[in-house]
């Protein structure tokens, strides 16, 4: 501890008191210490009679003057001793107007010094520096502050920028300083917190009312000292931190005299009671929602008033444009202070940054990340999720096939794109049921797919796709697009059309899709579905939907549940190629040459769909399916026939309606050769419903007979199918016939009045309407025709039983034209794939579900080539349904073979012919699928592809020959498998 320091030596103190008279006289002014000292020395210096006293008085020095009349004098010790002696003897004279009350010695004044530490707090130094700079009207920035520290505080180590930034932030939190766009300022008594709790009603309060707001909580800092804001108009804006966005246009207030500032401070603490004082003193009362700003100057009151008016209402309280607004003494300023951009900390949580400031910081860091961009991004992500969900539904088993997912307006592109996409294995019954219920109305002009609602499978309603889709796809032989994965992979070896786009004319949409499916052999399993036509396109598509599902993979229960998937568990599955092919074909695909073998299934399906009563049909379908799978086992199909016969009567009305609808659709498309009014089906239906009932009964009987005969024929049929399967390897190299050829075949079909291809939505155009009326019409319409055919059939062969069933199993083997399909077909559209085997004339009448199923003539392997050619043509035709009636070749074919068509249109086609046709259609369908690409070495695919026209012509010629042969057989010769086999080679190319 330091030694005590003597502040003053020993002295003599004189305690004086004023005289009464002097008090009265000199009350106005109080004499000072020096004046009293001079008066005291003069009075004693005149004591000439006491030379020692006079000499000592002259040597006195003024030590100090203490209030209450204490005079401290010092002099050499001898002189002080003389004064002591004079006071003892009462000889010491007082100064004028005073009297001496006491005299005494005062000890020397001593002080113990206090040592200082060497630590200098940076915060204090920064505050001092900022205060000095504010006083000097220097803009305080981090750079200028460092310079001042180096210059005026040499004893302090210069802090780094990071330390300086951190220290300043701490001072702001402690409210020792605050930051604005013009720099840092010291928080002084004139700087106060503005309340942020003013209500909406207080926004326009006058300054006199501001006192009410003061007690509220404080949030923001505002300096009322003009000196702290003066001389900064031209100063460059400076931000405290990178995240801070401050106003660049802040105007500083003029410098104020210290007394005025003090007065303002006092008044602000008193509640800001008088508006005049606010204007004069330049107090700034800024609330979060209501700010009253006046600038003060040391000018007269009027000058201050004008200055206050210049602060008009504006969004920025320091905006450059000071527009004068007529106001009274003060002008209200509605804006938040400090602005939202300022990084003001929250009162409660010092670490909390206001939301707006955070937004500004985010903008500084990542300008792209804005609210708008976030909203857009959110919308895009939502769309993406929806689309993803949409696509995921495409692969789900519960979703319908392509056609249902996409609206018709997107028809071609979406369907084609979907054909490439793998579909879910199967559509749930519910979805199929919905699809059936919601089949869109047919629009003759448009072939684009309608966005079809899912059809619940539970309803017996025929599964009919939208007429547009039906038109586009049913006739298009798109059924072939549903080829089994195995069959497709064979074609995959060399697919000349692999790279072709599927965006052809909308009319040939189904056709192109079929090609696509064929062309995309690589896709198997669920991917086969995309190739298939949307279920909305044709009811047989329901069956197709099954086929679309990887048949090997699809559970039989689904098929059975639909009664559409005709898997016979007892029958070992045929090549998946055939199976997929069969299923890929619409049930009446026989008509569409895609589902040659499916017609039987389709008929069964229709039976199930329309009758909805006969549960035996599913088994029949399964058997037929297994039969198809085996390709050689037609036995199961015949066995299943009996059940169909039983249910046929139920299905007949719906079939008739479907036929009627189909005819109407065909008329709209210009596919029918005769006007709708001329349609014998409709006339017959309208004229004679009794005959229709008779037909139904006849069909039932025929179905029964067929079932019996089919049982007999099953063995032979299986053998025949097996042979055909063996031949199928070679036959698989099916020719790819052009659409013209197919169209011709289709034309032939159309020529058949009853043959408004009833392949349910899948195979028959009548299904486009998705109504059973077509069947009814065809039934009624062809009562007479059926009768003629029946008579002819009876004449033709024993096999042709009155019921239309062929008794001999041998006959049924190859022809395998189920009487049911024939008979039903007569009532229903005569789904007569005349293209495939003119001889067989595929009397596939979609109307007769059971008969139709059988109706496809599944010719032997040899016939398969013919079938392929025909199917190719048919498939193409199906793809281009409009071309059926239009192509001259088709017309010519119609001219040449009207009788043949009628013959096959008859509902009572022999079961033998049906079986043959069924087999032929099955083989044909297989070959047709292989047309896109076939592994067979002998496949004429390349030739047929290279010269489709020549192939078509040859096919037509062969068909003509075949028809002639059929006529010959028609005389009375039974169409035995032996007789049919020789005919089939004629069609082979």
Curated annotation (Swiss-Prot):
Disease linked to the protein: Pre-eclampsia/eclampsia 4: A hypertensive disorder of pregnancy characterized by new hypertension (blood pressure 140/90 or greater) presenting after 20 weeks' gestation with clinically relevant proteinuria. It impacts 2 individuals, the mother and her child, both of whom can be severely affected. Preeclampsia is one of the causes of maternal mortality and morbidity worldwide.
GO biological process, one term: positive regulation of phosphatidylinositol 3-kinase/protein kinase B signal transduction
GO MF, any single term: RNA polymerase II transcription regulatory region sequence-specific DNA binding
Species assigned in the record: Homo sapiens (Human)
InterPro entries assigned to the protein according to its UniProt record, in alphabetical order: Storkhead-box_winged-helix, STOX1/2
Transmembrane segments: none
Gene behind the chain: STOX1
Tissue: Expressed in placenta, including the invasive extravillus trophoblast cells.
One Gene Ontology cellular component annotation held by this UniProt entry: nucleus
Job description of the protein: Involved in regulating the levels of reactive oxidative species and reactive nitrogen species and in mitochondrial homeostasis in the placenta. Required for regulation of inner ear epithelial cell proliferation via the AKT signaling pathway.
Extent of Polar residues compositional bias: 390-399, 497-508
Protein keywords: Activator, Cell cycle, Cell division, Cytoplasm, Cytoskeleton, Disease variant, DNA-binding, Mitosis, Nucleus, Transcription, Transcription regulation
Segments of this protein annotated with the region Disordered: 327-346, 389-470, 497-556, 631-651, 926-948
Biased composition (Basic and acidic residues): 526-556
Compositional bias per record (Basic residues), positions renumbered to this chain: 427-436
Name of this chain's protein: Storkhead-box protein 1
One Pfam family hit: Stork_head
């Amino acid at each position: 501890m330091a030694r005590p320091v003597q502040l003053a030596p020993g002295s003599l103190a004189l305690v004086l008191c004023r005289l009464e008279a002097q008090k009265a006289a000199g009350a106005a002014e109080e004499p000072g210490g020096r004046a009293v000292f001079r008066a005291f020395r003069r009075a004693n210096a005149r004591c000439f009679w006491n030379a020692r006293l006079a000499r000592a008085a002259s040597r006195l020095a003024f030590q100090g003057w203490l209030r209450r009349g204490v005079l401290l004098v010092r002099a050499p010790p001898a002189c002080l001793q003389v004064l002591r002696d004079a006071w003892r003897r009462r000889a010491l004279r007082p100064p004028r107007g005073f009297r001496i009350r006491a005299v005494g010695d005062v000890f020397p004044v001593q002080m113990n010094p206090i040592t200082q530490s060497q630590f200098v707090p940076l915060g204090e130094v920064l505050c001092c520096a900022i205060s000095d700079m504010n006083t000097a009207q220097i803009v305080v920035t981090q750079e200028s502050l460092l310079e001042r520290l180096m210059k005026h505080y040499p004893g302090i180590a210069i802090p780094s920028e990071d330390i300086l930034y951190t220290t300043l932030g701490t001072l702001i939190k402690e409210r020792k300083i605050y930051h604005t766009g013009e720099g840092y300022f010291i928080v002084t008594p004139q700087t106060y917190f503005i309340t942020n709790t003013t209500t909406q009603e207080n926004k326009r309060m006058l300054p006199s009312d501001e006192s009410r707001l003061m007690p509220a909580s404080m949030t923001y800092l505002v300096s009322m000292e003009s000196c702290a804001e003066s001389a900064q108009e031209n100063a460059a804006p400076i931000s405290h931190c990178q995240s801070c966005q401050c106003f660049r246009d802040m105007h500083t207030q003029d410098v104020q005299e210290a007394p005025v500032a003090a007065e303002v401070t006092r008044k602000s603490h008193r509640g800001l009671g008088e508006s005049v004082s606010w204007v004069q003193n330049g107090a700034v009362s800024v609330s979060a929602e209501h700010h009253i700003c006046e600038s003060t100057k040391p000018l007269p009151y009027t000058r201050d008033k004008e200055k206050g008016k210049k602060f008009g209402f504006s969004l920025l309280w320091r905006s450059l444009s000071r527009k004068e607004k007529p106001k009274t003494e003060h002008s209200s300023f509605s804006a938040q202070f400090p602005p939202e951009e300022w990084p003001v900390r929250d009162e409660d949580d010092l670490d909390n940054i206001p939301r707006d400031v955070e937004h500004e910081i985010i903008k500084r860091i990542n300008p792209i990340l804005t609210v708008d961009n976030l909203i857009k991004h959110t919308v895009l992500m939502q769309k993406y999720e929806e689309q993803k969900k949409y696509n995921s539904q495409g692969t789900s088993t519960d979703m319908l096939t392509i056609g249902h997912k996409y609206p018709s307006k997107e028809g071609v592109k979406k369907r084609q794109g979907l054909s490439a996409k793998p579909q879910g294995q199967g559509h749930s019954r519910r979805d199929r049921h919905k699809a059936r219920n919601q089949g869109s109305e047919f629009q003759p002009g448009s072939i684009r797919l309608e966005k079809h609602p899912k059809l619940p499978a539970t309803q017996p309603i025929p599964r009919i796709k939208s007429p547009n889709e039906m038109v586009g796809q049913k006739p298009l032989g798109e059924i072939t697009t549903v080829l089994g994965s195995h069959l497709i992979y064979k074609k995959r070896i060399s697919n000349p059309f692999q790279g072709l786009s599927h965006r052809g004319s909308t009319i040939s949409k189904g056709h192109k899709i079929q090609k696509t499916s064929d062309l995309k052999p690589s896709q198997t399993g669920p991917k086969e579905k995309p190739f298939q036509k949307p279920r909305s396109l044709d009811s047989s598509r329901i069956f197709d939907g099954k086929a679309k599902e990887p048949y090997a993979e699809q559970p039989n229960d689904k098929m059975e549940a639909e009664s559409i998937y005709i898997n016979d568990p007892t029958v070992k599955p045929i090549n998946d190629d055939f199976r997929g092919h069969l299923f890929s074909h619409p049930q009446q695909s026989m008509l569409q040459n895609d589902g040659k073998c499916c017609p039987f299934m389709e008929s069964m399906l229709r039976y199930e769909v329309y009758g909805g009563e006969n549960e035996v049909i599913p088994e029949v379908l399964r058997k037929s399916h297994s039969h198809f799978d085996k390709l050689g086992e037609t036995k199961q199909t015949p066995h299943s026939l009996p059940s169909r016969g039983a249910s046929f009567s139920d299905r007949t009305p719906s079939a008739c309606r479907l036929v009627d609808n189909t005819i109407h659709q065909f008329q709209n498309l210009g596919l029918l050769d005769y006007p709708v009014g001329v349609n014998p089906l409709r006339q017959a239906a309208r004229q004679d419903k009794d005959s229709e009932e008779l037909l139904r009964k006849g069909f039932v009987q025929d179905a029964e007979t067929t079932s019996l005969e089919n049982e007999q024929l099953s063995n032979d049929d299986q053998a025949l199918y097996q042979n055909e399967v063996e031949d199928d390897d070679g036959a698989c190299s099916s020719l790819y016939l052009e659409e013209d050829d197919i169209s011709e075949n289709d034309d032939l079909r159309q020529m058949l009045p009853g043959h408004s291809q009833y392949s349910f939505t899948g195979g028959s155009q009548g299904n486009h309407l998705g109504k059973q009326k077509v069947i009814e019409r065809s039934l009624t319409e062809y009562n007479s025709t059926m009768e003629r055919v029946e008579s002819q059939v009876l004449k033709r062969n024993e096999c042709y039983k009155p019921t239309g069933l062929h008794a001999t199993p041998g006959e049924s083997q190859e022809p395998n034209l189920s009487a049911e399909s024939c008979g039903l077909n007569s009532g229903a559209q005569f789904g007569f794939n005349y293209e495939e085997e003119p001889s067989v004339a595929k009397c596939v009448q979609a109307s007769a579900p059971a008969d139709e199923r059988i109706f496809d003539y599944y010719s032997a392997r040899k016939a398969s080539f013919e079938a392929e050619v025909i199917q190719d043509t048919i498939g193409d035709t199906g793809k281009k349904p409009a071309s059926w009636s239009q192509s001259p070749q088709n017309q010519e074919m119609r001219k040449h073979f009207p009788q043949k068509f009628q013959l096959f249109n008859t509902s009572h086609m022999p079961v033998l012919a049906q079986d043959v046709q069924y087999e032929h259609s099955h083989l044909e369908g297989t070959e047709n699928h292989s047309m896109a690409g076939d592994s067979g070495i002998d496949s004429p695919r390349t030739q047929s592809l290279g010269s489709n026209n020549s192939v078509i012509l040859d096919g037509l010629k062969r068909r003509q020959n075949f028809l002639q042969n059929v006529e010959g057989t028609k005389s009375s010769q039974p169409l035995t498998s032996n007789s049919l086999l020789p005919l089939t080679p004629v069609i082979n190319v």
